[in-house]
Amino acid sequence: LLVTLNKGDYVMAGVNHNSHGAQVIFPDDPQFEGMPKNADDRRFMVMPAYLGGKYQMAGMKWYGSNCENKASGLPRSILMMMLNDKDTGAPLALMSANLVSCYRTGAIPGVGAKYLARKDSETVTIIGPGVMGRTCLLAFLSVCPKITTVKVKGRGQRSLHAFEEFVKKECPQIQQVIVCDSMEEAVKDSDIICVTSTAPVKEISHISQKTGSKKVHSSVCHRLHGLMMIF
């Protein structure tokens, strides 16, 4: 897949064939009854593309996002994926894309860590212990086998507890999970810092960080037109 993308054998949306997709963002003050009101993470988005190489496939990801979904026991984003025959346009598959998207989102920071993180990285920080935080952690562990400590910063005890249980079950190489009360505590002395919540970037940019550490902001895609920040 990455080789195919590197060759440029793909087409995405937009006149430059490289657009991340198109968003539907509602007005701050709707003038029509029933129209949703703009809010944090309240949007619909479609991401169409064609992929060549051995795949020869067209398709798209479509999702709606609303932070208020949590009150109904639903994930913030609910995603679907459609695959189509590249020539006829006939639908080949329509499926849930939440799991696929989460692992894709985690895999990209993993690739970044493989080439940019310190080879002796031992401590990783996860800011935002949700599903994306979990998949990012799995990706980091797959390319940085010396990681033994995870520091986590979250907003609620339920998500923090669930994250701890996940690490105990799925990440046997982790010897210590540290739940942090502040950003300063979470960021200090970490080799890899991963932000998967909607916390503003400025919350960590001013904090003294370990020399050579790598920062990954996986949750700012909708604000930065799909750019994954790894530096």
Predicted features by range, described:
Residues 197-199, 222-223:
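Short glycine-/small-residue-rich Rossmann-like dinucleotide-binding loops
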Residues 174-190, 205-207:
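Short acidic low-complexity segments
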Residues 129-130:
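Glycine-rich Rossmann-fold phosphate-binding loop(s) that bind the pyrophosphate
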